[in-house]
Every structure is written in C-alpha cells, then in structure tokens.
Amino acid sequence: MKNPFSDNPQIEVVSSFSELINSNFQADMNAMCWHRNLAGDFKEIVAKLELKENITEVSIEDLLALQLSEKGNLAREIILKDIQQLTDFGASPSLNLLKCYERDEELDFISTDVYSFHIDRSPIETDTFLCTYYGAASDIVANDQVEQKILIPEIREQLKKLYDGPEAEFETFLEEYFFDLH
C-alpha cells in the first residue's frame, strides 16, 4: 500500500492497531495514521442513521439496529471491532455522525472553533484517536509551517484590548479562553 503521507514527516504511518497504540511521538512527528483500505459500505451506514443534531452520537445499539446489505454489514463489523479494540485498550470511544461543528463567530479577528487549525492540549499525557470512516478526514499541518495567532502582533494587540486584567495574567487569559491553541 502506497504511503499517502510520505511527503509529511510529521505523520507516522503504522500498519496495525497494535503498532498505533504502542508507538510514541518523537522529533517533528505530531500525528500517527493507521492507514487502511477498508472493505464495506460506510456510506450506507451514514445514509441509514438519523442525524438528530449537528453532531449525533451513535450507540452500538443504533448500529446493530440498522438493516444493512452485505457490504454495509462489513462496514458495521469494522466499526464495532474498532470500538472494541479501543475499549480493550482502556479508551472511551464514541462514534459520532457529523453534519457540522458550531462556528465561533464571536470575534472577527480570531476564531477558536475546530475549523481553525488548532492544537489539542491536556494537563496530562493522553491519546486522542480520530477515525474517519466516510467523508473528508481532518487536515494536518506541520508545526514548522504555522504561526500561533497570538504571536501575530495585530491579533495580540486586539486580545490585549479584550483582556481586562493585570499584565502578569495575560498568558493565563489566553490559555483559559483557548486562544493559545490557534
């Protein structure tokens, strides 16, 4: 299988679930991809699920209740196996059907929604697994190809105008409102 990320040194491609969960980030790498050519009709599953909100959580029971073709059933089995493997690993997987994420339109000079390239932060080391079965996957940008918006002088000045507190706590304000992640 050709590595679709060979031009992106920040993405490590693995060939199995075991390799995915047992690999560590190092150097410039900031993402791992378990690239698979999945059999089955994931589009059929999406078409038969009911979108209740912009983001609808899909339970195992919801999946099992679907009347599917043979190819749809293959897709369902892959999803169920992935959920089980993640659960056995100690993760808390959730399956979501997405229409769209909410947009952050509060400020016209900086956005903090998921449509803005961003990083994730956790006070403890944690694993986040994103899996796209149908539709466009998330984009990724190398760390050395981006600049934090809070370091752009014009944006930083706007944020300082928005902030109403002591200068010594400005960085805390940026973290508290997630401006530092974009």
Specify the residue positions occupied by each region the protein language model found.
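Residue-level signature for short turns and capping positions that connect secondary-structure elements
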Residues: 39, 100, 145-146
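A structural signal for short, well-ordered beta-strand segments and their strand-loop junctions
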Residues: 32-35, 92-97, 128-131, 140
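Short acidic, gly/pro-rich beta-turn/loop elements at beta-sheet edges
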Residues: 42-44, 105, 142
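Catalytic core of non-heme Fe(II) oxygenases with the double-stranded beta-helix
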Residues: 113-182
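Generic preference for hydrophobic/aromatic residues in regular secondary structure cores
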Residues: 11, 31, 95, 107-109, ...
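Extracellular-facing segments of soluble proteins and assemblies that are Gly/Ser/Thr-biased and enriched
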Residues: 70-115, 120
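N-terminal auxiliary "cap/dimerization" subdomain that precedes the catalytic jelly-roll/cupin core
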Residues: 1-90
